[in-house]
Amino acid sequence: MAERPRKRPCGPGEHGQRVEWRKWKQQKKEEKKKWKDLKIMKKLERQRAQEEEAKRQEEEEEAAAQRSNQGRPYTLSVALPGSILDNAQSPELRTYLAGQIARACTIFCVDEIVVFDEEGQDTKSVEGEFRGVGKKGQACVQLARILQYLECPQYLRKAFFPKHQDLQFAGILNPLDSPHHMRQDEESEFREGVVVDRPTKAGHGSLVNCGMKKEVKIDKKLDPGLRVTVRLNQQQLPECKTYKGTVVSSQDPRTKAGLYWGYTVRLASCLSAVFAEAPFQDGYDLTIGTSERGSDVASAQLPSFRHALVVFGGLQGLEAAVDADPNLEVADPSVLFDFYVNTCLSQGSRTIRTEEAILISLAALQPGLTQVGSRPASPLSGPRM
């Protein structure tokens, strides 16, 4: 019987190679499994991130909708003659009087202040300076400049207001402390800023100084020195050298968030120009004149409106402004207004100064204006006495 050949025993090297091969295959399997698990985890993370982003966008849309409901749809304008500064006895008192008017208008959320010349002097810009009592029109210029200075946030004044004689005593003025006058670390969705003169990369927006520790990079390229309203992004990267934001209309804080965002200042050469040069397409749809000869303000039933105007007279009342206006052929100022009201019946003083009349009248009118201004304006609605 032939002997079977015996298997040659494998050497230690071959056995070692077989063991290493098994280990390598096992290792590859584990690595493949880890890679698959990692891929699944990344996919889950992407899905989670997308869900969080969708949820964040939904929350932002809900917040925006809530803000739009909280917004104030109407505007309030005040017109007064610049000649009231002529009654002040010194430059310091003239400056302080202008500050009182600015404070009164800010307290009652006035959106526009119109300074008109009741003597009919043609003054349409703030160029020039006040040269003393008796100079026609120059009091309007000084009043407008001080009003603009006070409305501007403190961190922007150096950029927009160089040294000027009209602002010589601005240091005695009380600050307005309105919502757009913010501290450096104060958090807010909106901020006022000035475009800085600094080069940026092609396709990138300009840099804006908003009074914060970092400048804000906006979405548009704008000319340096321009004052803008910026809406800051909710998500900011702490390690980034700048904040991110978007340029929006200066009306957005009022219409979308219900914030009072200061006032604009307009000069009018006469009383009729207050109406004729209105910045709104259809003008003012509610006009109110104030006088001691007017009807009781309590009896006035205000209609719904979008743009209201309240007009105050000077030392001689609105009658003097009507007489001096070459464009008006009426003697009774009440025909110019939807309502001609007396806001302080049974007054104890023979005269009420204009700065006092602003506070008294706006306090009397505010409840009615707030109530009817929040309703949508009807094209058929008209004044009701």
UniProtKB/Swiss-Prot annotation:
InterPro entries: Alpha/beta_knot_MTases, NA-bd_OB-fold, Put_MeTrfase-C9orf114-like, tRNA_m1G_MTases_N. It catalyses: uridine in 28S rRNA + S-adenosyl-L-methionine = N(3)-methyluridine in 28S rRNA + S-adenosyl-L-homocysteine + H(+). Residues 15-35, 47-58 have a biased composition (Basic and acidic residues). Its EC number is 2.1.1.-. S-adenosyl-L-methionine binds at R293, G313, N342, T343. Residues 1-35, 47-72 are annotated as: Disordered. This is 28S rRNA (uridine-N(3))-methyltransferase. The lineage of its organism: Eukaryota, Metazoa, Chordata, Craniata, Vertebrata.
